[in-house]
């Protein structure tokens, strides 16, 4: 990775080895795949989508639909006034049947389905999904090994928001953008692609109060312009950013779980960037540097606070708890809303928890769950920090503590997920009450409310 780095840091239990959900940061990778395809003559940005998917068109295509090109999809200007919400196997047909109320190229509307259409076009023309197509062209030359992507119902990759990768690989890709396609002396993707992709192609609108100033600076080919002159970014929901400052020869990678993303970008551009000098030379020794290094080395999310409770630990370990609907009481809520490990923008489904049991060791507790017919065990630290465990192909970090005599608090975070799940377990005589919520603090910025649930479990009778 041919560059100097100022700092890199993570808040424990997260660290550099875990993939992070990119959300719409994925769009910049999908656009780059289109750039390579254009370079190789596989496609032209002037091609019309009606010519690429003739068998999926409505019976009488509108004149506006006939005008949509790949260029229009890249700039979020296909003419849709609303976005389709269809991940089924027929989603391409749904997109092509959606009303095109505006002439393409004249109206901006953020449209993840439009980016998915770019992924579908690439697959139609090459037989390869985005990540496979990029493997030899981008990923291997840059040494990117962690990229994965979720699939839509027809097997097309969710190029508009389904990718994950580690922070280091996000930095490599963002650095590639900053170098306009050059890597270690070789021009992998021609410079003129980035001259189009990384500059404003269409006007965008913020809100009337100016709270989202960095979303009102214009849009390129699946990347956003920033307020700082000449800067641009790959941008994913909840604060997944790869920001490029060309005149400072600087990139900044941010992975967060917040809805206050404008505040995040404002802090970067107003509190940090003014103090960055491209030709600063060797800085004199500073005692503050050591203090900052020590502080960042100890960054950690706070674990659950409380105490041990030997009496209740022994008591509850003797029982298996079964969800109330399975006990025949359909008036009580089931556990389908409980998201162990936290929710995400594209994974809001879960299965009801049928059974659970608790056991306790010297410094950890073990929560065994039967969910959707599968048995899982989560390990939670009852001392300092978090304990790691693996379940269902994912790594989880857990922390637990007794809040009161009969109330146990647990927090479980999926390491390749966005946030975490916090659960309050209140043990009663013959049952327990489980209250669950997402750790993501919602301020309504994305119109998505983190999940909350309340359900009852009873002691399983022999």
Report residues per predicted region.
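Active-site-proximal alpha-helical segments within enzyme catalytic domains
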Residues: 117-121, 161-182, 240-257
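Structured C-terminal helix/loop/strand segments within mature extracytoplasmic catalytic/sensor domains
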Residues: 236-303
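Active-site helix/loop module of the DD-peptidase/beta-lactamase fold
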Residues: 21, 25, 40-78, 97, ...
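Short, small-residue-biased leader/transition segments that mark boundaries at the very start
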Residues: 1-6
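Peripheral terminal and inter-domain segments
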Residues: 287-462
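Active-site Gly/Thr loop motif
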Residues: 195-254
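A small/polar active-site loop signature that marks catalytic segments
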Residues: 78-151
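Active-site SXXK
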Residues: 20-46, 73, 118-122, 170-177
């Amino acid at each position: 990775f041919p560059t100097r780095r100022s700092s890199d840091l993570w808040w424990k239990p997260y660290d550099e080895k875990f993939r992070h959900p990119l959300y719409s940061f994925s769009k910049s990778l999908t656009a780059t795949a289109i750039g390579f395809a254009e370079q190789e003559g596989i496609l032209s940005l002037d091609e019309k989508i009606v010519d690429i998917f003739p068998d999926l068109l409505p019976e009488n295509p509108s004149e506006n639909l006939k005008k949509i090109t790949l260029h229009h999809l890249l700039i979020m200007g296909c003419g849709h006034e609303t976005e389709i919400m269809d991940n089924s196997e027929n989603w391409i047909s749904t997109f092509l049947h959606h009303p095109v109320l505006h002439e393409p190229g004249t109206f901006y509307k953020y449209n993840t389905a439009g980016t998915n259409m770019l992924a579908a076009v690439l697959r139609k023309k090459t037989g390869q999904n985005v990540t496979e197509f990029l493997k030899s062209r981008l990923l291997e030359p840059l040494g990117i090994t962690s990229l994965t992507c979720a699939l839509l119902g027809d097997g097309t990759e969710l190029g508009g928001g389904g990718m994950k990768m580690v922070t280091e690989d996000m930095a490599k890709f963002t650095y590639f953008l900053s170098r306009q396609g050059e890597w270690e002396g070789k021009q992998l993707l021609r410079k003129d692609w980035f001259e189009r992709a990384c500059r404003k192609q269409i006007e965008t609108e913020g809100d009337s109060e100016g709270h989202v100033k960095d979303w009102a600076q214009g849009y390129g080919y699946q990347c956003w312009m920033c307020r700082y002159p000449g800067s641009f970014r790959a941008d994913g929901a909840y604060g997944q950013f790869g920001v490029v400052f060309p005149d400072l020869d600087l990139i900044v990678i941010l992975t967060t779980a917040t809805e206050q993303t404008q505040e995040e970008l404002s802090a970067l551009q107003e509190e940090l960037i003014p103090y960055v000098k491209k030709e600063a030379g060797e800085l004199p020794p500073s005692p503050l540097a050591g203090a900052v290094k020590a502080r960042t080395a100890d960054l950690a999310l706070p674990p659950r606070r409380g105490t041990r409770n030997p009496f209740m630990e022994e008591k509850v370990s003797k029982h298996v708890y079964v969800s109330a609907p399975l006990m025949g009481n359909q008036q009580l809520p089931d556990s389908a809303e409980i998201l162990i490990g936290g929710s995400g923008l594209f994974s809001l489904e879960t299965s009801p928890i049928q059974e659970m049991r608790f056991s306790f060791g010297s410094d950890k507790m073990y929560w065994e769950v039967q969910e959707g017919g599968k048995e899982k065990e989560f390990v939670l630290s009852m001392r300092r920090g978090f304990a790691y465990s693996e379940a269902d192909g994912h790594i989880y970090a857990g922390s637990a503590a007794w809040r009161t005599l009969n109330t146990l608090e647990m927090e479980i975070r999926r390491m390749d997920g966005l946030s975490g799940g916090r659960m309050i377990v209140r043990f009663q005589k013959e049952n327990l009450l489980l209250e669950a919520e997402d750790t993501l603090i919602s301020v309504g910025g994305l119109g998505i409310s983190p999940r909350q649930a309340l359900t009852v479990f009873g002691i399983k009778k022999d």
